[in-house]
Swiss-Prot record:
GO cellular component term, pick one: cytosol
Protein purpose: DNA ligase that catalyzes the formation of phosphodiester linkages between 5'-phosphoryl and 3'-hydroxyl groups in double-stranded DNA using NAD as a coenzyme and as the energy source for the reaction. It is essential for DNA replication and repair of damaged DNA.
Entries under Gene3D superfamilies matching the protein: 5' to 3' exonuclease, C-terminal subdomain (1.10.150.20), 6.20.10.30, BRCT domain (3.40.50.10190), DNA ligase/mRNA capping enzyme (3.30.470.30), Helix hairpin bin (1.10.287.610), Nucleic acid-binding proteins (2.40.50.140)
SUPFAM superfamilies from the UniProt entry: BRCT domain (SSF52113), DNA ligase/mRNA capping enzyme, catalytic domain (SSF56091), Nucleic acid-binding proteins (SSF50249), RuvA domain 2-like (SSF47781)
Organism of origin: Salinibacter ruber (strain DSM 13855 / M31)
Catalytic activities: NAD(+) + (deoxyribonucleotide)n-3'-hydroxyl + 5'-phospho-(deoxyribonucleotide)m = (deoxyribonucleotide)n+m + AMP + beta-nicotinamide D-nucleotide
Swiss-Prot/TrEMBL GO biological process terms: DNA repair; DNA replication
Keyword Iron annotated: no
Encoding gene, per UniProt annotation: ligA
Keywords from the UniProt entry: DNA damage, DNA repair, DNA replication, Ligase, Magnesium, Manganese, Metal-binding, NAD, Zinc
Official protein name in the record: DNA ligase
Native organism taxonomy: Bacteria, Pseudomonadati, Rhodothermota, Rhodothermia, Rhodothermales
One GO MF term attached to the UniProt entry: DNA ligase (NAD+) activity
């Protein structure tokens, strides 16, 4: 069964100190990065949009109350999620921003009041349009011809999908110019999606062919556009609705309404049936209510209404704050709900040993999808809601992910219902399960020897953010485990090509490539290796802090909890988790076996760590020989901060080709802007080789 990844259940009002806030912030960052990865990279989210937004807002609140907790890689400074390398990456001519999600009418009215006051208008005109539940894409036309397609990616860079986009029948390869002249360069954005009926037919065909079906149209659309073989994309029933022109070469229009009129004249489809021009927010709210009533009858999935200030002068006045344009809001729909019964409860064991209770439900249809499972998060949640086996419950499914139990319908009880408690022993390895005092966290103590943990740990260990063994994806990791070839991480380094050639889908070249990649992974930066180990509560930021404080792995292994808590941003709970991990003989044994295999760790923070100390950099555009994450990591290794937005604390903006609004923002603030040559010159002045 798939792992159900829990999310932190935090009471922010109970946090009254910086150490406690630091622990909470690290938990939230780790959870958000994980969910970004599942949403943007795997196309397999395990939390609803509402739950993600709740976590995001909690982290925003903590960082606002404790500014010292803000980190350059915090999800609050990101527009979106990470980009895979397989398709290649491109830099967007202008950032593809995300929209602030709101769920209550009061929030919408507050948004509208802000617009009205800051624009100095009695009535603000909005454009209200459906928020499609698909994959955001960008197309670039030059001289009327399609030259590039890309996914949104992290908002600054995206995956290059030109060949795939060209297979979508509704996408013009050449724009019409009979009704309106076509600009020399046009950058348009839209949402790729599948109609419900076409998605259902597509899934039926896959089922008949013995292939895995997609959970929902959004995942199907995203997976189809990310194919390496465009012939596969061509066979998928994809469509695109366009909604925006990026302001990269100045604006030829005064309002968003004018853009929506121009797009179809060029052959770019917009959702004309459900777009409304609204004079005042009441009209937009009425349109939202109408779409809520009609959403199940629409031929495609939408999950809310996007409300935008119509005129672009208003956009300029309101501007962008962090990751959100202040001139727009996404008013999300309420989650779909249904009543069913709990047939059984069981627990799943995640990568870090976290135990998650899951309810087995009597099958019920929610929003057109049959639901048979619901996450219960933790024992505290079970006790608080008094959930028992046999109960009739109200469930909700928001964002097409694993549903949640909203409440028990106690009037339906007949006395046969049975209470449930997380077991004292791990159901997979038999090790002791430790339950926290507040019952919000339970962990299997089996560590690296627990098969359930190991299955997920191996995937994490090989991931791009960890040791980056590119050829060891999830399916291949599962294959190695199921074949009995590896039981611990160190077994990876005992594999031989002959072992792989016995397995399906391996030829001589692919087997040798994987062996070479595994061998290369023995040379690692200390912080990446610490992150790869999957220590509970240790994300990439905490791993970096540890590498900055301890020169070697041995020094960290020998550190006690008191020594660990002297590090800024590492509280007692995180320190206990680290010390417990390295005190475990099985964990230390695995690390020793990896050393015997040739593990070599380099600590990039041990030398020249302060050469750029005190400086804050912002990178924009494309840099030759650097990915965005690589150059940010490089300056951080030399003591600098790397942030995603320009502020009064920014010392330098490094701008390459395709630099967008960040360069303009720097010019407006009088912040030095460096091209790549000037950036390298600065590094040389500090005695740093790049």
């Amino acid at each position: 069964m798939p792992d159900v990844d829990p999310t932190p259940d935090l009471d922010l009002e109970a946090i009254d100190s910086e150490p406690a806030a630091a622990e909470a912030a690290e938990q939230l960052r780790a959870a958000l990065r994980h969910h970004n990865y599942r949403y943007y990279v795997l196309d397999a989210p395990v939390v609803s949009d509402a739950e993600y937004d709740r976590l995001f807002q909690q982290l925003q609140t903590l960082e606002a109350e404790y500014p010292v907790l803000q980190t350059p890689d915090s999800p609050t400074h990101q527009v979106g999620g990470p980009v895979r390398d397989e398709l290649g990456t491109v830099t967007h001519p202008a950032p593809m921003l995300s929209l602030k999600a709101v769920y209550e009418e009061d929030e919408v009215r507050n948004f509208a009041e802000t617009c009205r006051e800051e624009l100095g208008r009695e009535t603000v005109t909005y454009i209200a349009e459906p928020k499609f539940d698909g994959l955001a894409v960008e197309l670039i036309y030059e001289d009327g011809r399609l030259v590039q397609g890309a996914t949104r990616g992290d908002g600054e860079t995206g995956e290059e999908i030109t060949a795939n986009v060209k297979t979508i029948k509704g996408v013009p390869l050449r724009l019409r110019d009979d009704a309106r002249p076509v600009p020399d360069r046009l950058v348009v954005r839209g949402e790729a999606y599948m109609r419900k009926d076409e998605f259902n037919a597509f899934n039926r065909r896959r089922e008949e062919e013995g292939k895995k079906v997609f959970a929902n149209p959004r995942n199907a659309a995203a997976g189809s556009l990310r194919q390496l073989d465009s012939n596969i994309t061509a066979r998928r029933p994809l469509r695109i609705y366009f909604y925006e022109i990026a302001p990269v070469d100045g604006r030829d229009f005064a309002t968003h309404a004018e853009v929506l009129e121009a797009l179809p004249e060029w052959g770019l489809r917009v959702c004309e049936d459900h777009i409304r021009r609204c004079d005042g927010i009441d009209a937009a709210l009425a349109h939202h209510a109408a779409l809520v009533d009609r959403r199940d009858d629409l031929p495609y999935e939408i999950d809310g209404l996007v409300i935008k200030v119509n005129d672009f002068d208003g956009h300029e006045t309101l501007g962008v704050r962090d990751r959100d344009p202040r001139w727009a809001a996404a008013y999300k729909f309420p989650p779909r709900r249904a009543t069913t019964s709990i047939e059984d409860l069981f627990v799943q064991v995640g990568r870090t040993g976290r135990i998650t209770p899951v309810a087995v439900l009597a099958p019920v249809e929610v929003g057109g999808v049959e639901v048979t499972r619901a996450s219960l998060h933790n024992q505290n949640e079970i006790d608080r809601k008094d959930i028992r086996i046999g109960d009739t419950v109200l469930i909700e499914r928001a964002g097409d992910v694993i549903p949640q139990v909203v409440k028990v319908i106690e009037d339906e009880r007949d006395g046969t219902e049975a209470p449930y408690h997380i077991p004292d022993a791990c159901p997979v390895c038999g090790s002791e399960v430790v339950l926290s005092d507040d019952k919000k966290q339970a962990f299997c103590t089996g560590g690296m020897t627990c098969p359930a943990q190991f299955r997920e740990r191996l995937k994490h260990y090989a991931s791009r953010e960890a040791t980056d063994i590119e050829g060891l994806g999830d399916k291949r990791a599962e294959q190695l485990i199921d074949a009995g070839l590896i039981q611990t991480i160190s077994d990876l380094y005992e594999l031989e090509k002959a072992d792989l050639l016995q397995l399906e889908r391996y030829a001589d070249k692919s087997a040798q490539n994987l062996i070479d990649e595994i061998e290369a992974s023995l040379e690692q930066d200390l912080d990446r290796f610490l992150y790869a180990l999957g220590i509970p509560l240790v994300g990439s930021a905490t791993a970096r802090l540890l590498a900055q404080h301890f020169d070697t792995l041995d020094a960290l292994v020998d550190a006690d909890e008191d020594a660990l808590t002297t590090i800024d941003d590492i509280g007692p709970e995180v320190a206990h988790s680290i010390a417990t991990f390295f005190a475990d003989d099985a964990n230390r044994g695995v690390i020793d076996e990896m050393r015997d295999a040739g593990l070599t760790l380099t600590n990039p923070y041990a030398e020249d760590a302060a050469r750029l100390e005190g400086l804050t950099f912002v990178f924009t555009g494309s840099l030759e020989g650097w990915t965005r994450s690589a150059v940010q990591r490089f300056v951080e290794q030399h003591g600098a901060n790397a942030t995603s937005s320009v502020s009064g604390n920014t010392d330098y903006v490094v701008a390459g080709p395709g630099a967008g609004s960040k360069r303009d923002d720097a010019d407006d603030r009088g912040i030095p802007v460096l091209d790549e040559d000037a950036f390298h010159a600065l590094l040389r002045e500090q005695g740093i080789d790049a």
